[in-house]
Amino acid sequence: MRALETIATLREYRKSLKESVGFVPTMGALHKGHQSLIERSLKENSHTIVSVFVNPTQFGANEDFSAYPRPLEKDLALCEGLGVNAVFVPKTSEMYPYEIEKRLKLYAPTFLSHSLEGAMREGHFDGVVQVVLRLFHLVNPTRAYFGKKDAQQLLIIQHLVQDLLLDIEIAPCEIVRDSDNLALSSRNVYLNATQRKQALAIPKALENIKQAIDKGEKACEKLKKLGLKILETLEVDYLEFCNHKLEPLKTIEPTNTLVLVAARVGKTRLLDNLWV
């Protein structure tokens, strides 16, 4: 496995690849959720490249950039064990050669980025677009793999590819859950045993909402009340029902409904969702 630290070495390596290339962009602290993305890429492509880069532009002023876990040696060992061909591990100065005031300004589309996570984390998705477009430009993948857990991010990346006419297939990947049903996240390491038990209210709320939908309930307001009752011990940022354009829904639309939740357990903010 190649560990590529510079854009020059990445470009040289990429030129040598003649067949399909799968790409899994990450911020490191890899877990079984990332592993599932990597394994799918390995299955569907001749070559797989993973990036590990904690992107500063998608963190707000009061967020956990400096504290974000960076177990690079462990991440590299995981990738090598899975059979990844190369891992791109650039420094910030490689990805952002210019100071902020000299950079080209890139903005996520407002109709997808200013609600939900975008409303809670101003500028977050602008930072995501900044780094993902740069990585796409450098890696030039056949396919890129993103988890459905970050649903809003996935929708924005899909729109980015369509709007900028990029010849990249975006492959959405199912949410991976731990044995207790908590969605896997690099931030789960911040939870102590008591907090982890409290956090299980999140998947339980979504599961109960799904059961109610399966039994025929379509009124989003009733379903929201059901979910909020289960989440009452947590600090809920939002529990919303939207279509795939992130427009609010009053009634469930089969194959076009997202139930999105963000809640805090102690100081840890967790996301989860249900694709109906």
Curated annotation (Swiss-Prot):
It is found in: Cytoplasm. It catalyses: (R)-pantoate + beta-alanine + ATP = (R)-pantothenate + AMP + diphosphate + H(+). Its EC number is 6.3.2.1. Pathway: Cofactor biosynthesis; (R)-pantothenate biosynthesis; (R)-pantothenate from (R)-pantoate and beta-alanine: step 1/1. Its main location: cytoplasm. InterPro entries: Cyt_trans-like, Pantoate_ligase, Pantoate_ligase_C, Rossmann-like_a/b/a_fold. GO terms for molecular function: ATP binding; pantoate-beta-alanine ligase activity. Keywords: ATP-binding, Cytoplasm, Ligase, Nucleotide-binding, Pantothenate biosynthesis. CDD domains: PanC. It holds the Pfam family Pantoate_ligase. One of its GO terms (cellular component) is cytosol. Beta-alanine binds at Q58. One of its GO terms (biological process) is pantothenate biosynthetic process. The active site is at H34 (proton donor). Transmembrane segments: none annotated. ATP binds at residues 27-34, 147-150, 176, 184-187. (R)-pantoate binds at Q58, Q153. Catalyzes the condensation of pantoate with beta-alanine in an ATP-dependent reaction via a pantoyl-adenylate intermediate. The reaction proceeds by a bi uni uni bi ping pong mechanism. Belongs to the pantothenate synthetase family. Homodimer. HAMAP family: PanC. This is Pantothenate synthetase. It comes from Helicobacter pylori (strain Shi470). The lineage of its organism: Bacteria, Pseudomonadati, Campylobacterota, Epsilonproteobacteria, Campylobacterales.
